[in-house]
A protein has these predicted regions:
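Structural signal for interior beta-strand "rungs" in well-ordered beta-sheet cores
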Residues: 2-165, 169
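Terminal amphipathic alpha-helical/low-complexity segments used for targeting or macromolecular assembly
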Residues: 1, 5-6, 36, 42, ...
Length: 254
């Protein structure tokens, strides 16, 4: 373990093996860091939530997964709920200035670029990449292996495996991300067809997804994509219909 002498680590904080805490970082007593976590200068982990109703006496926590890197001036606030936990998964990379508000749940292998802002109760699925300066409304959900462009304004849910940009616009499947995760050609083809049917065959997207689930769904990935539509409280972002002759799934960017 390597702790800079100017770092502040409160009694009660739990640090795993081989953690590194750089100058002037603050780790409050409500925090548990997994093995190999690196906290860079000026980061504040486990601070009180920015909620005017919050009682500072509430016992709540932050949990950071093993191998995660928190760059300069990252803030991760503890939960507003007694016994609640704000979670950042394992092997994540949160770049400088990122804010993770109370009660968020960030999955494993997530990258949040500089100055990404997650409001309270936002969930981000594993293997998702978010570009710099993107901001997320409270209670929004982002599915696994999604990609959200820089400076995006997200107020609605973003399903798994898609790319999103601007103001709640889905612009196609995240084909590069799927390839990097080793998805087979058969699964990618099935996801393309599923994407097209849900977003471009007319009707309510939640109803379309439910109808498709009632059929024989071949892959766990497609089932996960469709099941995502049944949850949440913010509504689902809409897809931009810009056809591409190359991929035929609705985005010239793919």
């Amino acid at each position: 373990m390597n702790i800079h002498p100017t770092a502040i680590i409160e009694d009660g904080a739990q640090l795993g093996a081989d953690c590194v805490v750089h100058a002037h970082a603050v780790i409050t007593r409500y925090v548990r860091l997994g093995d190999g976590t690196v906290v860079h200068p000026g980061a504040v982990i486990g601070g009180d939530p920015q909620d005017l109703k919050f009682d500072p006496a509430t016992p709540s926590h932050v949990r950071i997964g093993a191998g995660t890197v928190l760059r300069e001036h990252v803030t991760v606030n503890r939960s507003t709920i007694a016994g609640g936990v704000t979670v950042v998964g394992a092997n994540c990379f949160l770049m400088a200035g990122t804010h993770v508000a109370h009660d968020c749940a960030v999955g494993d292998q997530v990258v949040l670029a500089n100055n990404v802002l997650l409001a309270g109760h936002v969930s981000v699925g594993a293997y998702t990449f978010v570009g710099g300066g993107a901001a997320f409304h409270q209670f929004t959900r982002v599915g696994e292996s999604a990609m959200v462009g820089g400076l995006a304004r997200i107020t609605l849910d973003i399903p798994p495996f898609v790319m999103a940009a601007e103001r709640d616009e889905i612009v196609g499947l995240n084909l590069v991300g799927l390839k990097r995760r080793g998805f087979s050609g058969e699964v990618v083809a099935e996801l393309k067809e599923c994407f097209r049917e849900v977003f471009f065959d007319g009707g309510n997207v939640r109803h379309r997804a439910q109808e498709m689930l009632a059929r024989s769904v071949q892959s766990a990935e497609v089932r996960g994509f469709l099941e995502f539509f049944a949850g949440g409280r913010r509504g689902i972002a809409r897809a931009r219909r810009v056809w591409s002759a190359e991929n035929e799934v609705g985005s010239a960017a793919l």
